[in-house]
């Protein structure tokens, strides 16, 4: 049974709630002091994990639509991608403000050079920015075939973002590995397209 347009609309509402409610939980956690003795790190990790979850969810849409024979699911991909960018931006802001401080924001450039995992993170964010800015139908029409080429850069983000996470943790735990393996599986499902894009 294929999903209807009405069901897709409700699915989009569910995506909004699933992506927005964690932000309210984040605010409440800060207000109530639910984080550990290092809340800045907790916030950075939380926002980073949310970004990765939404990135993986975005990549999952096409295989689900194709193998599940649900073509209308593709209509959810843009929304997931925009939420991924929103959480990625929050992740970047949380590091810049909480880790460096507003008075030392100029240190960000030096940090990017001395900490390679940050370089991967900022590259991932810049790619997400380019995808978010060009996610409109107007941009798609104006760019023509180049639009798809640009948006295939999400595969690069799917490689860099899990590496950024793995590299950033001081003690290796199962969670970063799970994200990396999941990303690898999702890329493997699109092996032919990924290989064509790499050429």
Curated annotation (Swiss-Prot):
Part of the MsrPQ system that repairs oxidized periplasmic proteins containing methionine sulfoxide residues (Met-O), using respiratory chain electrons. Thus protects these proteins from oxidative-stress damage caused by reactive species of oxygen and chlorine generated by the host defense mechanisms. MsrPQ is essential for the maintenance of envelope integrity under bleach stress, rescuing a wide series of structurally unrelated periplasmic proteins from methionine oxidation. Keywords: Cell inner membrane, Cell membrane, Electron transport, Flavoprotein, FMN, Heme, Iron, Membrane, Metal-binding, Transmembrane, Transmembrane helix, Transport. Its cofactor is FMN; heme b. This is Protein-methionine-sulfoxide reductase heme-binding subunit MsrQ. It is found in: Cell inner membrane. It comes from Yersinia enterocolitica serotype O:8 / biotype 1B (strain NCTC 13174 / 8081). Signal peptide: none annotated. Binds 1 FMN per subunit. The gene is msrQ.
């Amino acid at each position: 049974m294929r999903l209807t347009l009405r069901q897709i609309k409700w699915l989009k509402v569910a995506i909004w709630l699933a992506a927005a409610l964690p932000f309210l939980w984040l605010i409440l956690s800060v207000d109530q002091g639910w984080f550990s003795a290092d809340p800045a790190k907790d916030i950075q990790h939380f926002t980073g994990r949310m970004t990765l979850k939404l990135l993986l969810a975005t990549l999952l849409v096409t295989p689900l639509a194709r193998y599940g024979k649900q073509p209308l699911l593709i209509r959810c991909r843009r929304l997931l991608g925009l939420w991924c960018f929103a959480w990625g931006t929050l992740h970047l802001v949380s590091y810049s403000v909480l880790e460096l401080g507003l008075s030392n924001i100029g240190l960000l450039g030096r940090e990017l050079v001395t900490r390679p995992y940050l370089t991967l993170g900022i590259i991932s964010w810049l790619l997400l920015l380019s995808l978010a800015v060009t996610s409109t139908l107007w941009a798609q029409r104006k760019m023509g075939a180049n639009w798809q080429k640009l948006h295939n850069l999400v595969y690069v983000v799917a490689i860099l973002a899990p590496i950024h996470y793995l590299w950033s943790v001081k003690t290796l735990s199962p969670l970063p590995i799970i994200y990396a393996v999941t990303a690898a599986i999702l890329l493997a499902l699109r092996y032919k397209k990924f290989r064509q894009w790499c050429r």
